């Protein structure tokens, strides 16, 4: 299916947020996620379905000062 990740087009086989994160290389990284502008908590990612055309945002925390 075709989705966008951080504004870039991606073709993925996975159908949940958690599986997509693994497929695109985030694995178990500590990140925040939003699907179509709505926050998706870490404990909801495994069940949160993603559909063709959806927009996934993945944000990693910054460190330093």
Question: How would you describe each model-predicted region?
Answer:
Residues 1-64:
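Ubiquitin-like/PB1-type beta-grasp interaction modules and other compact soluble beta-rich domains
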